[in-house]
Amino acid sequence: MPEKRLSAEPPEVTEEEFENYLATDNFLVDYFNEFLSLPTFPEAIRFNVDYGVFEVVNDAPQLLEKQLKKILQNQQPRNPIYDVVRKGKSDSKSTQKSVPCEDEAINVNYSIMCLKREQGINWIKRERLPAFLESDCYFEYRLAKLISQATWSSTGMNFIVGTNFTPWILRRPPAPPPPSTDEDNYMIMKKFYVSLGQASYTQTKDWFTLAKESENTVTMASLPCCIPHHQTASPVIATASEIFDDGVHPRTIKSLSKSSKAVSELDEEEEGSISMKDSPSQALLRVYLEKKGGKERNLTLHFSSVEEFLDAYIIFILREAIQHITGQSLSDTPEYINYYKVSHVIFDKVPPVPSNKAIVSPPVEMVEEISKDRLENVSLSSESESIGPESRADWCISHRTYDIGNRREFERFKKFLKGTLGERYWWLWMDIERLKVLKDPERHQRHLEKMKKCYLVSSGERYLSAEILSKFKLLHGSRWTADHLKNIQAEVLKPLLLYWAPRFCVTHSASAKNASTELKFWRLRQEKPRKDVDPFPQMATLLPLRPKSCIPQTPEVQGEEINLFQPSKFKKLSKINAGTQQLGRSEPLNAVSSKDGGLEKGSKRLPESTTVVRLTSFTDISECLKPQLERKYTYTEEHNVKTVSNVGALGGFDMENLLQSLYVENRAGFFFTKFCENSGNKLWKHSVYFWFDLQAYHQLFYQETLQPFKVCKQAQYLFATYIAPSASFDIGLHQEGKKDIYMKIQPPFEDLFDTAEEFILLSLLEPWTQMVMSDKMAYKKVELQEETRQLDSACFRKLHALHKETISKKAEDTTGYAMAKLSLSDVSKQTEYWLNVPEGYKHFTFTDLLNNKLEFEHFRQFLESHSSSLDLMCWIDIEQFRRIIFKDQKQREEKSIYIKNKYLNKKYFFGPRSPASLHQQNQIMLLSGGWGRILHEQLDASVLVEIQKHVLNRLENVWLPLFLSSEQFASRQKIKTQMKDIADELLLQRHDRKIGVWKPVESKWISSSCEIIAFRKALLNPVIARQFQRFVALKGDLLENGVLFWQEVQKFKDLCHSHCDESIIHKKITTIINCFINSYIPPALQIDIPVEQAQKILEHRKELGPYVFREAQMTIFGVLFKFWPQFCEFRKNLTDEKIMSVLERRQEHKQKRKASDTEEDKAGKSGVKQYASTTGSLTKPVLGSESLLVLQSYGRQPTWCYSKYIEALEQERILLKIQEEVERKMFTGTSSFTNLLKPSTGSALSLKKNVSLHSIQR
């Protein structure tokens, strides 16, 4: 029978390891979130395990899901079974489906406030963690981790419990002391076989620096085949005490070597102890070989799945058979693996066990598939939910195993123990845990006395038999000491771990699942607690036995529903209770909605009046009370649900919150009790003690059989300890109250101490208010930031599917499954992907995509169609981060935080769709300092580089071959080269002018090398350069400066080649920068280059050296080159003597026209009285300009040009339009409109005549 070692030592969470546990242990996340949501704390916080951030509790997801369900129910057709009795009335309507209108965009986004990561972690450690480590939530978490070790197997399993085996401690080898510098240098010289001889100190130091850098360089090779590799890691783990070597994620490696025990395949299958990972691995199939004594033994094989191993092993067996028959050796092939030398096999992928032991939650697709037709079980939280208990039980049955691997199963186990002997072991273990953290001697002794009354005395509520007490050596009261109880705690755990937990697992076996009705009924009776027969049955009391002021009220659940059809903004949300909890007397213990409990979108802090009080769905209030306070039956129930306004007058809302806090004080780590103790006020401390002891007194009235002697004894104890004049814990009750209680103490009833209870509750209001205010003040120091989340809802997916009636449901489901499967493809199948790529495209690499903007855009769209664009976006963002200047720390920090929040969470990189395997994720987080670093704002740059490598690996080996083998890519490659060049030319006209996502254009505008040479020679020719300079001056304001800049840079290059003094070169650089890039004359940038290039030149002028102006000169060259063909056409019709005169004439005409336009703008703003002068100012410059052009052309041979004639007509049209616009604006509606119109018309006619005359002369 297989054996399994179990630990009796629970995990120990410390402040140093808290972040690592929180990032990896879902058990701890569940219990810590329950702790943070208790009514004791005014701010309800929860840890989102998917995003690794603490967030303010928000009910928006629940409200959204509720409305989605309502919409879906309204749009689904009515079941035809309801139309049986209504035949003929609604036949046409019975199967009609109300399809939602496509114009109505259903908004599933919601906003949530999150604590800033660094500040939030520090605040949690300082204000919440100490109390959590002393709370029942933490104790129960420790017990749950121990119980989760128990598993069930159909073939049986032998458990061995020990305290020297701790699977949850992160085993880290002690760091060796750093070697001395001399020893380190000696080892490097020995490794490289180098003797430095007569080298100087500087040369020696530089050489050692380079040698150390070469040692630290890691080469990442991406190979598509199985490669033998010599294992350099530590030897194979063989002993059972080292099975859980990473301390967090259990991984067992079964070794078949001589030093380890031989375990059968059935053992490995049933025990589940073969090494496996919880998420699909993206690693290559690699073989790690360990050398021992020069023989190739202990070969390690890594496979992505069991199926892949079986295929490879069957092929090996067939080859061996063929070799035996034919006599030909097949071991010479490179892919040959000798399985006779394999010591153990590691599987990177198995069907995901729905257990919270793993870092990665179950795949989203599996959860969606299971909950597709069960709307009531849809996950409403933003974090990844585990599979439901029934589904998980079905999965375990199909795999012939079962364990208590998550919080939900653990809660079922607690219910299974109700009324059994296992429950007594449970509470004894918990009481020992409580005893261990009590430091106050008085409270320590009081707790010991209560334990004796509960377990040792025969009338105790959880009395243990003499046999059990004798086994634990607790028969005598003197043995009930803290040290002895600590020593026997492991023995108390053994019955739970070795009997009750396996028995619970057995109930989920296949035989029990398929049992007959009688057997199921019998099993149900066994799970229920036994009820003792009461010979004197009690009568239900109709009136309450306690004042309303001492009972937590139940407000109505109020809240505004979120409109799903609004763009993105939400209204204020009223706080809603997380769930209805039951007190010992079956009174729901809910939160009190605050008057101003809304959280506005965009607000950075919660209002002071906001009080979020809630209990989680896992909290059982009957177990939150002390063991003596658990009430089995409720004889007094108030069926009237009270509203907020119905709260008793005693204290109002503060009293309600105080009562709720007191009822869960032990699960909150006695947070309020410690505040009262540390305040120094004895009355506050005594009042808290009295309230807890009073609940034990009330508990006696809710047992099945009333025991008058115990009631009388407890009443006398309370009176003597807290109320009597000489009481040791006097609560300060007034004399009349003491006398009244003394007169009614015989016989005692439940309402005997109601007066004292109201008195202490009123007195405790003051410390409660002080504690809440101080906690709020500390919380206000933490900065909040708003984040937008999207609800992952099956209802929304169904609604979205209703819009696509043309696509069949079956085809849609197949497509979705194929996409999900494709996005989670194994990297081990890289060879298959590349085999499907045509031979002509196999040379295509990811770098080629980056250099081809058109195909890069198609590749991005291809990934989006397969819902995998995150891979490319992640790679691009990290690449942009790497290219940010190191000195710009602020920008690098912002980009790093952005990458961390968007990609490094359990929705992508650390989730089921991660491009890295679980082992690779562990290596990356160990490189960053542990899994706790995921809770911080950013990771180191080296970690981001490693992440980028894994993302690039999947892009190159999975998505790129799929893209190259697609039909769309093949059809695009058949297009002519000329059409491709045109497409590239059009893409260059984009504003960013970048070929990739981050780097500038690489000479895509150049058509031929001959034209480049001709243009460069022209710019170096003083005459042609001067003509070209005047020509481009007509095209743009800064183009003329571009010619000068290009020439000055050429002179700077010649200066660098002359090997002159460095100061002269730096002076030249400064001159060029001051003239063209950072000019004192506005604008500062005098040439047509991007601002980013200018900024780079200013910041890196020293680092770039002689190449400081290289990119700027290339950009200017490209801009000017566009005008070179036009200039060549212009020179054809003119001689060299006439070129400058024509260009100067055009330049002067351009300046005059600009001045004319300026005057026209000024004239348009003038009043009616200044019309005549305005009209003159509009026409005179133009006429003067035209007459000047006539005089300048006088005496020359008149020529006529069609282009000039068209230009003159265009000018005439513009001037007439301006004139008409001025007239319409200035004189509409005036009495003198007709008289004033005549001179303006004459001016226009004269202007037209002059322009026409000038055109003819030209």
Swiss-Prot record:
Pfam families: RGS (PF00615). Expressed testis, including in Leydig cells and spermatogenic cells from the spermatogonia to spermatid stages (at protein level). One of its GO terms (biological process) is negative regulation of signal transduction. PROSITE patterns: RGS (PS50132). It comes from the Eukaryota. Its main location: cytoplasm. This is Regulator of G-protein signaling 22. It comes from Mus musculus (Mouse). The gene is Rgs22.
